[in-house]
């Protein structure tokens, strides 16, 4: 397996920088490495790791497909084939082929911070449709960002809409006597 991601580590204590090409196969190994690093830092809560993995998968996929490759989710109707076929064609041609995704990961004791930036034109994050409204239930657009907002503690978009910052605070441990005392009180 050829991983099309460049890594420069460490930037600082608990900080990593990745630069990914427009290859969806580069995403899972990066997420796996980040989750492994978190586990070594005591973030062994499986639910938290699952939530973080989901948010990272969605954010990196959005940066790849909607950001760098500029493929609209409106192309997903009954079939996703046209969406992925266009993405595959664009991966190989200018200006899309030279665009990169940058990921900064800061793993701290009590929180994690991820900043993901693509080189696409961005989008108007203030006009995202609510995927839970009845008229949007069967549409694909907005679902990934909805998931990200619901699994992360803080989500911030930066103009022009090609950069997302996500934060999760470390969940309390069931082994923590102070946390257990709070449950009993």
Indicate residue ranges for each PLM-predicted region.
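Conserved beta-strand-loop-beta-strand hairpin that lines the nucleotide-binding pocket
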Residues: 9-15, 64-185
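Receiver (REC) domain switch/output surface
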Residues: 1-7
